[in-house]
């Protein structure tokens, strides 16, 4: 996956496991790092959770989908209400050239 993202250097990789809640809970906006780099949000399962951005866009959690954006763009996640959990990898990288 890192090759497909044109990664030169990994800044940080973190796994998030969000447990099922009775209703989807939207989390606050944040940035993953203070380093100006590229963020890759990679979904390991499909559920009704999502990643949302300040401009109002929402990306549905679909297994094997990756969302790629500048690390300085605030974003937030959510829980899931229709699966046992929501599993996401947050990968921060410097890209080649």
PLM features: residue spans?
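Fe(II)/2-oxoglutarate oxygenase catalytic core
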Residues: 1-65, 72, 78-87, 92-97
């Amino acid at each position: 996956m890192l090759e497909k993202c044109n990664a030169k250097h990994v800044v940080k990789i973190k796994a998030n496991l969000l447990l099922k809640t009775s209703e989807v809970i939207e989390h606050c906006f944040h940035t993953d790092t203070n380093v100006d780099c590229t963020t890759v949000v990679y979904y390991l399962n499909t559920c009704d959770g999502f990643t949302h951005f300040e401009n109002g866009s929402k990306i549905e959690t679909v297994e094997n989908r990756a969302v790629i954006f500048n690390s300085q763009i605030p974003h937030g996640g959510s829980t899931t209400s229709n699966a046992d959990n929501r599993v996401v990898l947050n990968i921060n990288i410097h890209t080649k050239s």
